[in-house]
Amino acid sequence: MARYIGPKCKLSRREGTDLFLKSGVRALDSKCNIETPPGMHGARRGRLSEYGVQLREKQKVRRIYGVLEKQFRNYYKEAARGKGATGENLLQLLEGRLDNVVYRMGFGSTRAEARQLVSHKAVLVNDKPVNIPSYQVKPGDVVSVREKAKNQLRVKGALDLASSRAPVSWVEVDANKMSGVYKSVPERTELPADINENLIVELYSK
């Protein structure tokens, strides 16, 4: 399945919530009515079946983290093999992706922008270039912006945006050095409360 590159508003309208795909802090503008699903039909959002609710939650999380369907299923399988709650394991794996960590540290204004930085070899992990967005960052790893990329306006702009965003506790960032430490795997209580990972577990358990 190809990665979606169309209007970000359309995805948020599909899920009925702002997925914050346009920037880390900027809400969707007034022209994007997330209460109405995309398309030319009426404004009513159809009532979903139990399966439909589970599917929409999976799609929402997949789109938030920018993960393709096959990748997402593989993450679920890995989460199911791990110790502890499968849903929590799944979210922790998604949070540990390098592109997500770059976003959380404020070097990219969106996960898509962070993914592009990684793909363009603008990011170092423990002083070594890594260009794989799905690379799993480990506690203690140092993630930094490569020297030649530090003057990019998009990186500086992202850091400015990040200063307006509530910081997360599992990363420690030196904005001046454009470097940060992935301190620990986040606990479920530290992750977004508007995600119901149990619905995803129920979906894949069928």
From Swiss-Prot:
Residue ranges annotated for the S4 RNA-binding domain, each copy included: 96-156
Keywords per UniProt: Ribonucleoprotein, Ribosomal protein, RNA-binding, rRNA-binding
Cellular component aspect of the GO annotation: small ribosomal subunit
Keyword Coiled coil attributed: no
Record text on subunit structure and interactions: Part of the 30S ribosomal subunit. Contacts protein S5. The interaction surface between S4 and S5 is involved in control of translational fidelity.
Protein's job: One of the primary rRNA binding proteins, it binds directly to 16S rRNA where it nucleates assembly of the body of the 30S subunit.
Family of this protein: Belongs to the universal ribosomal protein uS4 family.
The name this protein goes by in its record: Small ribosomal subunit protein uS4
